[in-house]
Amino acid sequence: MKNRAALFAASLLAFATSSHAAPAELKIATWNLEWFMTPETLRALTPACTPADAPRIGARRSVPCDVAQGLARSREDIAALKRHARALGADVIALQEVDGPEAARLVFPDHEFCFSGRIAVQNNGFAIRRGVPFLCGPELTDLSLNDDVRRGVELRLFPGTAKEMRLLSVHLKSGCARDSLESTRASCGELARQLPVLERWIDAQAADHKPFAVLGDFNRDLRREPAGLSIWTEIDDADPPDADLVNTADGKAFQNCMNSQTFSGYIDYIILSRQMARGLVRDSFGRELFPPKDAQRRKMSDHCPVFIRLRVADAVGVAG
């Protein structure tokens, strides 16, 4: 709770001390950093790591033993991630699987942060380049199913101005990438329970007539969902009217982050409201692939960033 209050105070300071001038264009990205925490945190948690066959116990401050043994990142690994963040050059990045601001700062030293306050080491949040006015919005705690999975984190850019836009960082339940949400699998049931929470947030922004985006790790191929109940058909129902959505990955070829990967479709997405999509720079959707040498030698992540560019004035429907 103290950490969350500090983040909110920092966002107020960032808003108060900024020039409030919106840049003409923003580069927005999402990146799951795969169990990213400071080396000191990982060392402290390793002795009491959780075995693979241990029963699942909600949110707690622990790491799986395979993570403790296989994802201990060296200074060189962290430096490679930092280089990749610099190459990405995004103004706003939705982050997943990051312990919090202290860890995120190792990769994004020139950014401010909004993060969820979940006790577990996997948190959602945002990195915001210094100088971009923002406020940390409320956490979407209901999305976590009583903190069994990850919370949503809201970010408000250019708050209190005609150019205000709202972003939600999500990391939905894994284990139901292509199955029906009506499947009897427990993971599909949990994902289905998250769906109305997400839809309520979308509908609330639409009813408030604010441009908005949902971005992050959906743990699901939204472009190839099976028939029946699905994430996309539920959230993209244009009810209310401003809840009509655009998947920025539509029509784009899939790329793996490195040669050793064999995935066949995106699960990381940037979803825009129809209003915000009016500012989408044509052909700006992309994926920042890992350099081959870093992919081979360094412990990067099983995800690499997905990004877009937005013309701010068009995205919010006001004159520049």
Where are each of the predicted segments found?
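Active-site His/acidic residue clusters
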Residues: 169-187
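Bacterial N-terminal signal peptides
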Residues: 8-16
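Structured beta-strand-rich core segments of catalytic domains in phosphoester-bond hydrolases
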Residues: 92, 97-173
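N-terminal, active-site-proximal structural segment of metallo-dependent hydrolase catalytic domains
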Residues: 19-107, 119, 294, 311-319
